[in-house]
Structure formats: C-alpha cells, structure tokens
C-alpha cells in the first residue's frame, strides 16, 4: 500500500516519488516489560517457502518459490504471470496476505480491493474507496476457490487496506486487521477533508462472516497503516507503519493480548527501516524462517521500499531486542511489493513448482 499517513501531505508525497525521505531516526526505545531472549523454536517439517506479492507491473497476485530451504532466494513462477486476478470490486488486488489455517488443512489469501492503474486516484481511494476484502482459499496452494468479495467495513469507512489475520488462541478465532479512514457521514458526507488512517480489527471463524470492526490503533494526526504480527513465547510482536518522533517508518511493539488497545502495547523500537539503512519503507511483513533454512532459524521482517525497489529483508534473532539488520545478497523477484512469505513442506514446495512451472 502506498504510504499514506497524514492526508494533508498526500499530493506532495505522490509528486515526490521516488525521492521521499524520512525524518531523523529515533532508535530503540526500552519501553514496557523486558522479555528474556530465547532460543528460536521452529518447525522442522518445513523445507521451503512460497512468496505471494503484487508487483509494480500491475495489481494482481504473483507467486515465487524458494530455491531450496532459503528464505533469501526465490524464483518467480508461472512465467512471470499472475496466478490470481480480480473480477470483482475495483478490479485490482494489492497487498496479498496468506496464512495457513489454524487446523493446518487449508490456506487463505486476503487482499486489498484497489486498482490505481484503472484510474482511481489516491485521494478518491481514501474518501470513497472499497469497503470489501478479496479472499481466496485453497487446500494445496494450486487450486484456488472462486473469489470472495466480502464487505467488512461500514459505510463511513473510506477504505479497507492491507488486511492481515492471526489466530488468537485466547479468543479461539481469527483476528483480521486492516487500515481505514473513518468519517462522520452526517457532518462530512463528502469525506472531505481526507481522514487519517486507523488500524481496525474484526473477528471471523470462516473468512466469510465477520464481526463489526473495532478500532485497534488510533494515533492522530498522522495515523497508522500496514500492521503485521507474530507471536513468540506467549508475546505478540506487532510491526506497523507509523510516525514516531517525526520519523515515518516501521515501529515495533509488544503485548500479551492481540486485541489490546494502543495504550497496552509497549514500544520496542521505532524508525526500524531507516536505522537499518533502507529507503523510505512501508508494508512490513514478519515471518520466522525454517529450522533447516540454509542460514538458520531467525526472524525476517520484509519492508517495502515503495519508491521502486520493492521488498528488502531485515533480520533479527531477538524479537524483544528491537535490533534489525538489512540483509544483502538476497535474490527476490523483480520489485515485489507488499505481500507474504510462508513456510512450506517439501511436498507443498515441489507442488507449486510443478503446477506453475516456467516454460519460457
């Protein structure tokens, strides 16, 4: 998702691409409870990865497979053509997020319903954008269901961007979260001026029926977008695009409750991308590498250098420490944008490589 935090700077930011810069870094913040560094637990059954993303080429979903058990080396599949396209809503899909079901028997893809390339402006996309999520499911990552066009936002929400989901063991359901600008339709029926972005969440058991959304993160005037979450040793770690002390970048926070309000999340680090040496970034995506990964078990935080390079990997062996290092020497598809890397079994990896084999 294009970085949009303070709506008053939207037009100037668009005009400045790809020369956008962040304010000075603020560094690591030792706030909140300190969690002891632990050995990284991992699943020895996973022997590769799939990478789902959209591209600077268009607003569709693409797929790459890892070259062996290496989270830093991928080959784009299907002759570089998308594996999923939208036939509903705005006609484009961005920010695809994939998760394995809690039972482990299927996969879900959630994506943003948005097509800037079809003529929608970023301003209109925030004022009267889609209130829907685009959702697919599959048992094998090869054969996908029909597209589900699911309304999750009420009519006073201006957009529904960059959805992700995480299974909450306490609530026994999936928590789905996304960014929206929220308006007072009576006082501001034209949704002008544009509202700042908030992170909201809803719950679902089946990705068909959703609860009414609730506000999760509300931080005016700059707002928050693009949250991604991982759980380790009973603690949730959340990474979000936000402006902290003048630095519009990725912030890391922790909490023992996934749905806790902003005040109950403890800030670990801010300005993560710039501190690591990236260009301006958004669209963070966090995952844990496999036990047998050629570079060992660790955490990788993907960050989207949306000015042109796409995803770059940052690494850490300690989520609680808040120190992230920009990795070099990786091999990703050309300019992959906001998406997800998911661990696979060898059978799953070989399955997608065969089904979407490159023939050109």
Describe each region flagged by the PLM.
Residues 27-360:
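Carbohydrate-active catalytic/glycan-binding domains of CAZyme proteins
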Residues 1-37:
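Fungal secretory targeting signals
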